[in-house]
């Protein structure tokens, strides 16, 4: 017995029995991705919603194709196509109320357009301008995020602040499977779960972080399983089934709005095109893999359901295609009319009074551009 024990100042007590803070069982995702199209659940889907999803999918596919063509014409610096992932893009945009916020990643231009942003404005950043091109507050769409996962803490912060103010607002944050390897992903999910922020995280698992397959990114059974460690439910859904993605996201949005806290949704999908126009996808995947996923195309899946239920005929499908073509023609014409960008604008809106370092950088860029122009002029 120690001196302190003899004096009665120390009374050791057995530790309390350990109890989990949260029962993990209800948080676990299903073993298989949830599906609606081609199942009995399809009969319960709202016909008008299915038609709207179809029209937006067709428009989105054409938008991806036109934007990719604009890169080849030099009108866009880069375009990360979402061809094959349109179901996730459209469902994420349509599931939100007008008062809610969407936080997109760099590949989510289609979701931005489906949310109501002008198609030309949505491409402003990707054509090399210094700003995102649209007013985030007008459309409740955060600026496109080029750095991986940085939009996730922003979404959580906005959602948490809205709840503190008593605003009925839900934030939906989009990210790819590669973004789940970033520190911002952990910080966002941890904060959201601890403070029960009204936010939904949509992970579009398209199989690759540029060229890195999912098996080299995580050893978890699925990305949705990561939710359990944070104390939030994880949902697994077929990301090419637009009706299923919309239903799962709608459930998560309702839960968040009712004070139930965040949800992590993993949508299993596939990036049919290359990572960007600067990527050679044949170096890390084969044609057979791509063609196999084309058989599970989101537009074909929904079209088959609609025609089978008598909700879509050839005239309706042609109307959707014509509307998409009209949008593409307008996008093409307006992008070709855009004035050339002034690189010096990059330095204009950083500080009210430019710092010496900023002025130095501006002059350095000006000199480099002048030297480049002189070199071009000297060529025979």
Describe the predicted segments one by one.
Residues 41-42, 109, 206-209:
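A short, flexible beta-alpha/helix-coil linker loop
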Residues 25-27, 92-95, 255-256:
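A general structural signal for short secondary-structure junctions and capping/turn motifs
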Residues 38, 104, 236-238:
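Structural signal for conserved beta-strand scaffold positions within catalytic alpha/beta enzyme cores
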